[in-house]
Amino acid sequence: MSRVTAAAGTVLIFAWTSVARAQDGPGSAAELLRNAAVKGALAAVKTNEPQTIEDQIRFCEIPAPPFKEAARGEALKRTFQELGLQNVRVDKAGNVLGYRPGLAPRPHLVLAAHLDTVFPEGTDVRVRRAGAVLRGPGIGDDCRGLAVLVAIVRAMNDAGVSTPGSMTFVADVGEEGLGDLRGMKQLFNETLKGQVDKFVSIDGTGLGISHNFVGSLRYRVTFKGPGGHSFGAFGLANPIDALGRAVAKISDFQVPAQPKTTFNVGRIGGGTSVNAIPFEAWMEVDMRSEDRAALASVDASFHKAVDSAVAEENARWGKPGMLTVTKDLVGDRPAGSLPADAPIVRTAFEVTRALGWTASSGAGSTDANYPASLGIPSLNVGGGGRGTEAHALGEAFDTTDSWMGTQRALLLAIALAER
């Protein structure tokens, strides 16, 4: 049974004697909803939603291109401090952390949203309003997640909520593109190594729950040769021709529809002049799957295709070894999944149902990939509202009933912070 008592002006929540009961006991999420402190925090979320939206806009209008998240991170640091989080700090990677102690250090829940966007430096990040719709690069992905982090802390403060376990709120770096989850790797390999029991990332919009983790491998492939004049040195093996052969082979890959497995040559470059045989050409390749074996299979096909392309281009001109190739791994996100009956997954769906809503289950590539690969119960949830055109300059966020995502994230956090 839950019971609520007051101490030093703070409402203390004592609910469930074990995590198992929180996840298995009939009506356990409903029991939390009967708790006066929890009800107060949920009400505060709805009341505070205009402020949450203003925070979302404020964060979004601070540029945070890949590897340059510091300015936005500083804004989160100040906000964490203003909300009274403890030990607010920036770690070696640039993650911003703020600690909210519970009655005991464990269980320790980490809630995270990422600072970075996919948009390059110089992008106009001003947010435009049209009724309930906000438009701006990154407004949903992941400025909504950052605003929800702040809203959870604010609502718990407003209602005087304390939980048995502790929480750390993290605004992290390096989730997008070639960031390669560097923020998560720093967080779990050093900053909070061995200290985290559960992890929830808030990334994207709506009420989806992702507990299947799309892994990816990303390479920058560089073909090199002697180069020379297009007429005078004709007959030299051409790095761009080798690149073209490789792209043609990759485009013919056959991959399974289930588990969904994909490949993409996203960027290419090279050469110095129309009348010069290039000395270098490069491409960037992305491969994804939620299944580790399927990802390994397409990865093996990729290596074979590139090596064969170089051999064929050298053979074409009868000059073996003239061209060389390097394949630099620039991104490695582990694939995996949690079963639907995993405690953290059941809790997320139970909390959603207790609030009277439904949630879809899907796969995603988010910050949750990395802690999940370490065996830490992890998942990703949407931050509410409705997002469209993610990763596009016209990215939009419909604020209609967006408070629902914050309420769900708040109730999930409280449930997971129970003993």
What are these regions (language model features)?
Residues M1-A8, S18:
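Bacterial N-terminal signal peptides that target proteins for export
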Residues Q23-G40, Q56, P239-R419:
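Metal-dependent amide/peptide-bond hydrolase catalytic core
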Residues L115-A130, V196, H211-T222, E350:
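Acidic-glycine-rich active-site phosphate/pyrophosphate-binding loop
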Residues Y99-D142:
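Catalytic-core environment of secreted peptidases
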Residues A20-P65, F213-G215:
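N-terminal hydrophobic or amphipathic helices/low-complexity stretches enriched
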Residues I13-R21:
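C-terminal segment of classical bacterial N-terminal signal peptides
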Residues I53-R106:
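A non-catalytic alpha/beta surface segment that caps or lines the substrate-entry region
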Residues V133, G138-S216, P256, N275:
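Acidic/histidine-rich catalytic neighborhood of metal-dependent amide-processing enzymes
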